[in-house]
């Protein structure tokens, strides 16, 4: 009976230690240094669950989870110290043009895929107060955010997908004007 208990607790301790888990660490101690690189290797329209475990660190990335990616869980080591950040705002010019970004291109994270979960992570747009600056843009369906911090100033979370469902549990969402729209 003791052997059985040891096996069960070893399995519980290695929750993310399986072939369907990718590891990200900014300091280079994992197979990926950037979250975007881990997202890029995920297969389109997966029928199985894929976990991307992100170790503590500051990840300055503008992430898009495209519509063809499904069944992905992005899990941070802890919400306070696992941070995805970017600093675009509505008055930044689109590279190579004389047009400004406007609100909807300023996201730090844009989720177009369905059945995507974020846990224990901070998503922030840390742009100065120079205009709208979206931290999270949700377009996919059945999106789940658990124990996440979503931080910004104006227009922090955009839930603009038509006929989509987004669930926030034990999350802290912070902003100023229209911080959830």
Residue ranges and their predicted role:
Residues 27, 55-57, 171:
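Active-site-proximal beta-strand/loop segments in catalytic clefts of secreted hydrolases
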Residues 1-14:
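Bacterial Sec-dependent N-terminal signal peptides
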Residues 11-24:
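Short aromatic-glycine-(Arg/Gly/Cys) micro-motifs in beta-strand/loop hairpins
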Residues 26-31, 51, 70-132:
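Right-handed parallel beta-helix/beta-spiral solenoid domain characteristic of secreted/periplasmic
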Residues 33-44, 59-68, 74, 84, ...:
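Short, T/G/N/S-enriched strand-turn elements that build extracellular solenoid repeat scaffolds
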Residues 22-53:
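Acidic Gly/Asp/Thr-rich repetitive segments characteristic of extracellular carbohydrate-active
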Residues 57-60, 143:
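Short, internal active-site loops enriched in acidic
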Residues 109-181:
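Right-handed parallel beta-helix
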